[in-house]
């Protein structure tokens, strides 16, 4: 994130909200990276002075964590979100697909199981929310 903030002249406010009880939990490497890259590629607007990115994490069940990345970018139509969500489960490669999101979704499912992965929705800020559900594993 420091590299992105330096590259974009601190043109984005980043907020963190992680429950303390999840700080000792294991997550696969670079779990946020493709989501943050997508924000700067598709949602960041250099003409705005109110670009925001929220990174959150909490325990939603004894055995499940919910991590999320929310932005206040331009968002997507419901139809586009539905197509993107369906493409996450596709093994077919298409240059127009979001390879980073699909790769992350599939890595999560391989590591944590088929009940876990990414969910993409619109949010109240006008942008997108990408929610990551993973199994809670205490770091040893």
Give the residues covered by each predicted segment.
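Two-component histidine phosphotransfer core
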Residues: 1-133
């Amino acid at each position: 994130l420091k590299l992105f903030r330096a590259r974009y002249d601190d043109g984005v406010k980043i907020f963190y909200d992680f429950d303390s009880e999840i700080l000792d939990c294991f997550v696969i490497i670079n779990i946020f990276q493709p989501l943050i890259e997508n924000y700067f590629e598709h949602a960041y607007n250099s003409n705005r002075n109110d670009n925001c990115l929220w990174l959150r994490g909490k325990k939603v069940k004894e055995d499940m964590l919910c991590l999320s990345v929310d932005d206040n970018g331009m968002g997507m139509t419901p139809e586009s979100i539905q197509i993107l969500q369906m493409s996450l489960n596709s093994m077919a490669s298409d240059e127009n697909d979001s390879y980073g999101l699909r790769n992350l979704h599939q890595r999560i499912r391989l590591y944590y199981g088929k009940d876990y992965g990414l969910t993409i929705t619109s949010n109240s800020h006008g942008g997108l929310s990408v929610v990551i559900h993973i199994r809670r594993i205490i770091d040893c």
